[in-house]
Amino acid sequence: MSQASSLRERREAVVREHMESENEHDFDTTLGTFGHPRYEIIPTGDVHDGAEAVMAYFKESRTAFPDQRNELIGMHHADDAVIVEFTLKGTHLGPLRGFEPTGREFSCRMIAVFEFEGEGIVCERVYFDAATILAQLAAGA
Protein backbone atom coordinates (compact mmCIF):
# COMPACT_ATOMS: atom_id res chain seq x y z
CA MET A 1 0.00 0.00 0.00
CA SER A 2 1.41 3.41 -0.94
CA GLN A 3 1.68 6.26 1.55
CA ALA A 4 -0.93 8.22 -0.43
CA SER A 5 -3.51 5.42 -0.35
CA SER A 6 -2.80 4.81 3.33
CA LEU A 7 -3.35 8.51 4.15
CA ARG A 8 -6.49 8.47 2.01
CA GLU A 9 -7.87 5.49 3.95
CA ARG A 10 -7.05 7.10 7.32
CA ARG A 11 -8.75 10.35 6.29
CA GLU A 12 -11.82 8.48 5.10
CA ALA A 13 -11.98 6.68 8.45
CA VAL A 14 -11.78 10.04 10.25
CA VAL A 15 -14.66 11.42 8.16
CA ARG A 16 -16.77 8.32 8.81
CA GLU A 17 -16.11 8.62 12.56
CA HIS A 18 -16.99 12.32 12.38
CA MET A 19 -20.30 11.73 10.61
CA GLU A 20 -21.30 8.71 12.71
CA SER A 21 -20.53 10.53 15.95
CA GLU A 22 -22.74 13.43 14.80
CA ASN A 23 -25.60 10.96 14.26
CA GLU A 24 -25.03 9.59 17.77
CA HIS A 25 -24.80 13.11 19.26
CA ASP A 26 -21.37 12.18 20.58
CA PHE A 27 -19.98 15.64 19.94
CA ASP A 28 -16.84 15.16 22.02
CA THR A 29 -15.85 12.44 19.54
CA THR A 30 -16.85 14.69 16.65
CA LEU A 31 -14.63 17.48 17.99
CA GLY A 32 -11.81 14.96 18.38
CA THR A 33 -11.74 14.40 14.61
CA PHE A 34 -10.61 17.99 14.10
CA GLY A 35 -7.06 19.25 14.22
CA HIS A 36 -8.84 22.60 14.66
CA PRO A 37 -12.67 22.70 14.83
CA ARG A 38 -14.21 24.91 12.15
CA TYR A 39 -17.54 24.71 10.32
CA GLU A 40 -18.46 26.97 7.41
CA ILE A 41 -22.13 26.79 6.42
CA ILE A 42 -22.06 28.38 2.98
CA PRO A 43 -25.82 29.02 2.37
CA THR A 44 -26.20 30.93 5.66
CA GLY A 45 -22.74 32.49 5.76
CA ASP A 46 -22.21 31.12 9.28
CA VAL A 47 -18.68 30.35 10.41
CA HIS A 48 -18.14 28.45 13.67
CA ASP A 49 -14.45 28.61 14.54
CA GLY A 50 -13.00 26.84 17.57
CA ALA A 51 -14.32 24.13 19.88
CA GLU A 52 -16.69 26.40 21.82
CA ALA A 53 -18.28 27.87 18.69
CA VAL A 54 -18.66 24.46 17.04
CA MET A 55 -20.23 22.99 20.20
CA ALA A 56 -22.68 25.93 20.29
CA TYR A 57 -23.61 25.13 16.67
CA PHE A 58 -24.26 21.49 17.61
CA LYS A 59 -26.48 22.61 20.50
CA GLU A 60 -28.46 25.08 18.36
CA SER A 61 -28.99 22.71 15.43
CA ARG A 62 -29.90 19.70 17.60
CA THR A 63 -32.30 21.79 19.70
CA ALA A 64 -34.16 22.66 16.51
CA PHE A 65 -33.75 19.19 14.96
CA PRO A 66 -33.14 16.66 17.77
CA ASP A 67 -33.32 13.72 15.35
CA GLN A 68 -30.99 15.32 12.79
CA ARG A 69 -28.98 12.66 11.00
CA ASN A 70 -26.89 12.21 7.91
CA GLU A 71 -26.95 9.35 5.44
CA LEU A 72 -23.77 8.90 3.46
CA ILE A 73 -24.09 8.68 -0.33
CA GLY A 74 -20.47 8.79 -1.43
CA MET A 75 -16.94 10.06 -0.81
CA HIS A 76 -14.43 11.58 -3.19
CA HIS A 77 -10.80 12.38 -2.46
CA ALA A 78 -8.57 15.34 -3.26
CA ASP A 79 -4.98 15.99 -2.20
CA ASP A 80 -6.00 17.90 0.93
CA ALA A 81 -9.70 17.07 1.33
CA VAL A 82 -12.42 14.46 1.40
CA ILE A 83 -15.61 15.55 -0.38
CA VAL A 84 -18.74 13.87 0.96
CA GLU A 85 -22.16 13.67 -0.63
CA PHE A 86 -24.89 12.88 1.88
CA THR A 87 -28.54 13.38 2.72
CA LEU A 88 -29.35 15.36 5.86
CA LYS A 89 -32.69 14.64 7.51
CA GLY A 90 -34.49 15.91 10.56
CA THR A 91 -37.73 16.99 12.18
CA HIS A 92 -38.23 20.62 13.22
CA LEU A 93 -39.16 20.15 16.89
CA GLY A 94 -37.45 23.14 18.52
CA PRO A 95 -36.98 26.87 17.91
CA LEU A 96 -34.50 27.93 15.25
CA ARG A 97 -33.37 31.54 14.97
CA GLY A 98 -36.75 32.96 15.89
CA PHE A 99 -38.81 30.39 13.98
CA GLU A 100 -41.11 28.26 16.07
CA PRO A 101 -41.10 24.49 15.52
CA THR A 102 -43.27 23.25 12.67
CA GLY A 103 -43.12 19.53 13.46
CA ARG A 104 -42.30 18.96 9.80
CA GLU A 105 -39.53 16.77 8.46
CA PHE A 106 -36.93 17.73 5.90
CA SER A 107 -34.57 15.79 3.69
CA CYS A 108 -31.87 17.57 1.69
CA ARG A 109 -28.97 16.33 -0.39
CA MET A 110 -25.72 18.08 0.57
CA ILE A 111 -22.01 18.28 -0.08
CA ALA A 112 -19.41 18.71 2.66
CA VAL A 113 -15.77 19.42 1.98
CA PHE A 114 -13.60 18.16 4.83
CA GLU A 115 -10.27 19.97 4.56
CA PHE A 116 -7.30 18.22 6.18
CA GLU A 117 -3.89 19.04 7.51
CA GLY A 118 -2.23 15.68 7.97
CA GLU A 119 -4.84 13.35 9.46
CA GLY A 120 -6.91 16.04 11.22
CA ILE A 121 -9.87 17.93 9.83
CA VAL A 122 -9.28 21.69 9.90
CA CYS A 123 -12.55 22.75 8.28
CA GLU A 124 -15.88 21.25 7.32
CA ARG A 125 -17.47 23.43 4.62
CA VAL A 126 -21.09 22.53 3.87
CA TYR A 127 -23.03 23.35 0.69
CA PHE A 128 -26.77 22.86 0.22
CA ASP A 129 -29.87 24.50 -1.20
CA ALA A 130 -31.48 26.25 1.77
CA ALA A 131 -34.70 26.74 -0.23
CA THR A 132 -35.13 22.95 -0.37
CA ILE A 133 -35.21 22.78 3.43
CA LEU A 134 -37.32 25.92 3.89
CA ALA A 135 -39.94 24.72 1.40
CA GLN A 136 -40.31 21.43 3.27
CA LEU A 137 -40.55 23.11 6.68
CA ALA A 138 -43.05 25.70 5.46
CA ALA A 139 -45.22 23.26 3.46
CA GLY A 140 -48.87 23.95 4.16
CA ALA A 141 -48.05 26.98 6.32
Question: Model segments located where?
Answer:
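C-terminal and inter-domain tail/linker signature
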Residues: 1-141
